UniProtKB/Swiss-Prot annotation:
Keywords assigned by UniProt, alphabetized: Cytoplasm, Lyase, Metal-binding, Rhamnose metabolism, Zinc
Catalytic reactions on record: L-rhamnulose 1-phosphate = (S)-lactaldehyde + dihydroxyacetone phosphate
Protein's name in the database: Rhamnulose-1-phosphate aldolase
Coiled-coil region: none
Annotated SUPFAM superfamilies: AraD/HMP-PK domain-like
Pathway in which the depicted protein is active: Carbohydrate degradation; L-rhamnose degradation; glycerone phosphate from L-rhamnose: step 3/3
Lyase in keyword set: yes
Amino acid sequence: MIMTDFIDSPYVRDMAQTTENLYRHGWDERNGGNVSLRLTKEEVEAYAGTDKVLRQIPIKFDASELAGKYYLVTGTGRYFKNMVEFPERDMGLIRISEVGNSVDLMWGFNDGGEPTSEFPSHLMSHIARLKQDPDQRVIMHCHPTNLVAMTFTIPLSSKRFSRTLWKMHPESIVVFPEGVGVIPYMCPGTNEIGEKTAAKMADYRVVVWPHHGVFAAGDSLDETYGLVETVEKSALIYTTIREQGGEVLQSLTDKDFRDLIKRFDLKANEDFLTPDAVGATVD
């Protein structure tokens, strides 16, 4: 039986299409943004060209907890607008080594490339999310314009951000009933920001990086993309309200939240369902 080449797999196709959509939205300019997708051994071995280690690539993180797991990941310095045309150059299929401080390249990065510089942060978040849900496969980092803008105008509080976004549209609490996590501004590309993000990923599928972007998690590329889309739509509505003068005459209420929770049988974040007292500070 002739096996299909990995480049023609739905995983490569979907990754290329998703990253192009992120670029078209304006959320991943230049080489901004990165995505990783966990694949099973069976999914990988069903395709030709994935059975030999092409080279080993060191990583600055002990990922031994994920030893043997496969990830399709975008490359460092690569432009998402080029992924559809050059998938074998701009993404790679890697396997975490047993010792955890390197990865085996099984496919891709055919010009000598390496995984995104944020890959340690991805792996930390994959570890955190797998502990919450074994079906979680995707970590996505991008720069949604309106959500980033909100980090300049709203206190950097998970509760304040979540309630503000929930109030913008009824789909918000339905799609991210746990809310969104917010961390302080930190230098990107470091293990420190990865650790802080992973800690929030224990409770949230979306973590806001102030003045920068988001990390989001999901079961599939489509689901994770849709999660970011929904968060950004709420942020766009918030931005549009401010452009119209900022006066809000009516909006979704806490009772409306409760009605949505009941209607869609949601496990919402109870801590975020009531506003704080004036002057209160929360994470």
